[in-house]
Amino acid sequence: MCEHNLLSSGYVAPLLNFHSPDSLYLQNLRGNGVHLSGLPQMSYSRREVCSLPWSSSNSCTAPAQSRAYSGYSQPFFSNSAAVSASLNTHKKGSLEESGRYYFQDVSHKSEEPGRPNAAYASEQSSASNGLSNLERRQLNAVAPNELSCIEQPESDASKQSVSSIAPFQPSLSAQNIRPAFTDGLPWCPSQVRSRKKRKPYTKPQLTELENEFMMNEFINRQKRKELSDRLELSDQQVKIWFQNRRMKKKRLMMREHTFTIY
């Protein structure tokens, strides 16, 4: 088997739509020189055919295939030697140009598929920088809030609970889990302070206050001060007790009044 040479005229000429010089004047002959039947005899030689002037009203343009390979149409020459020489040079030049353009295109597209372009890489870097700056600002905004929550003073009740929990080491784990649900977030204690435990009045104090209330429902500041010192109560406690007692009396009176109506 013979390999086709890419630069041979018999292989490239049909692709470029160029005819060999012999096809211009020997189209009615076979390859062995025998005349085909049914075709008129040629009464002139090869030299006369090549020397005849080419005059045609219609301009012969190369088809789209030849333009795709060469880019322009090849003019016809009167001399067969010039035609063959121009054909050979044109074949070589077109092949070199087409090969060069092909490899140039391949070199442009031979970049790695997983490698991003420069513009895309710059966009990604700018986007990542923007996200990092945003996260940094959020962290800076959250940090002072956490510090302010942590630095809040604890109430007296929490201190007492800590002091009472200290001797019992085995129950520390269970007691640490409970405040996590009641105080809110573990790193930020709840804003609501625990209410002080209500200190009940003793019986002697209640009897003394009741006697004073029977004598006078409203007391002045001086009398309230004397009661607080005598009963070992604060001025606020005495004041609140008298207010509550007056409201209680009022409710009882309203209830009796409603019963009498109905």
Swiss-Prot record:
InterPro entries associated with the record: HD, HD_metazoa, Homeobox_CS, Homeodomain-like_sf
Keywords: Developmental protein, DNA-binding, Homeobox, Nucleus, Transcription, Transcription regulation
Primary site of residence: nucleus
Entry-linked CDD domains: homeodomain
Cellular location(s): Nucleus
Segments of the chain annotated as binding DNA: 194-253
PANTHER family documented for this protein: HOMEOBOX PROTEIN HOX-D12, HOMEOBOX PROTEIN HOX-D12-RELATED
Role noted for this protein: Sequence-specific transcription factor which is part of a developmental regulatory system that provides cells with specific positional identities on the anterior-posterior axis.
Protein name, per record: Homeobox protein Hox-D12a
Organism encoding this protein: Danio rerio (Zebrafish)
Species classification: Eukaryota, Metazoa, Chordata, Craniata, Vertebrata
